[in-house]
């Protein structure tokens, strides 16, 4: 009996991008389409009270990521690039980079944060996102707006450099720069490869 054809994206996929680029939405959709586990790095990182393991207990955060990606197939959504590279990039097949324009990211962040705050959505079972503090640019790292505006070009340059690094030559990088490209990417994606029997 012939072996099933591998999926064109592989079995281990990472979705990255700036804040509000749609990483979790696309990652969850990919995982469902491919019938593999979905790993959201924010869910592994944030404890009640907006305590981030990446800052308070990096070893514990890294261990959580290792455990979540121990299997042979998964879709990971989120950045945390240092931790991602240390834990699973050596086994990564495909990285989908959501490189949307900064004005669009700001608008998406405003709409998302407002919706979450109005509905008091509980994120990752632990926290409710505030709205007004996200807009307080002068508060630096406490403001999501600050992160988007000040880190956009830096993150873009960093990702472009990673794409050229020999150590990551085994990874297929897919760069999506508009919402239409993301939609077309999803629509063109085949379903899960049939399992061997």
Regions found by a protein language model. Give the residues of each.
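NTP-dependent small-molecule kinase module
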Residues: 2-10, 142, 146-197
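Hydrophobic anchor at the beta1->P-loop junction of P-loop NTPases
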Residues: 15
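The conserved Walker
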Residues: 19
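Conserved lysine of the Walker
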Residues: 23
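Hydrophobic positions on the alpha1 helix immediately C-terminal to the Walker A/P-loop
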Residues: 26
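Active-site signature of alpha/beta-hydrolase-fold catalytic machinery across serine-
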Residues: 29
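Conserved nucleotide-sensing/catalytic segment adjacent to the nucleotide-binding pocket
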Residues: 37-95
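A glycine- and Lys/Arg-enriched "phosphate-lid" helix/loop adjacent to the NTP-binding pocket
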Residues: 100-155
């Amino acid at each position: 009996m012939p072996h099933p054809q591998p999926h064109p994206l592989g079995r281990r996929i990472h979705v990255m991008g700036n804040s509000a680029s749609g990483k979790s939405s696309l990652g969850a959709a990919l995982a469902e389409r491919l019938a593999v586990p979905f790993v959201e790095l924010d869910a592994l990182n944030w404890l009640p009270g907006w305590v981030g393991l990446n800052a308070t207990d990096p070893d514990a955060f890294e261990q959580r990521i290792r455990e979540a990606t121990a299997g042979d197939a998964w879709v990971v959504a989120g950045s945390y690039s240092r931790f991602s590279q240390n834990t699973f990039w050596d086994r990564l097949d495909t990285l989908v980079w959501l490189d949307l324009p900064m004005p669009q990211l700001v608008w998406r962040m405003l709409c998302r944060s407002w919706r979450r705050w109005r509905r008091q959505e509980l994120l990752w079972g632990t926290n409710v996102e505030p709205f007004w503090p996200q807009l307080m640019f002068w508060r630096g790292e406490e403001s999501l707006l600050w992160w988007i505006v000040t880190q956009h070009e830096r993150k873009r340059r960093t990702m472009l450099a990673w794409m050229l690094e020999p150590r990551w030559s085994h990874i297929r990088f897919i760069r999506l720069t508009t919402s239409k490209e993301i939609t077309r990417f999803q629509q063109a994606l085949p379903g899960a490869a049939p399992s061997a029997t």
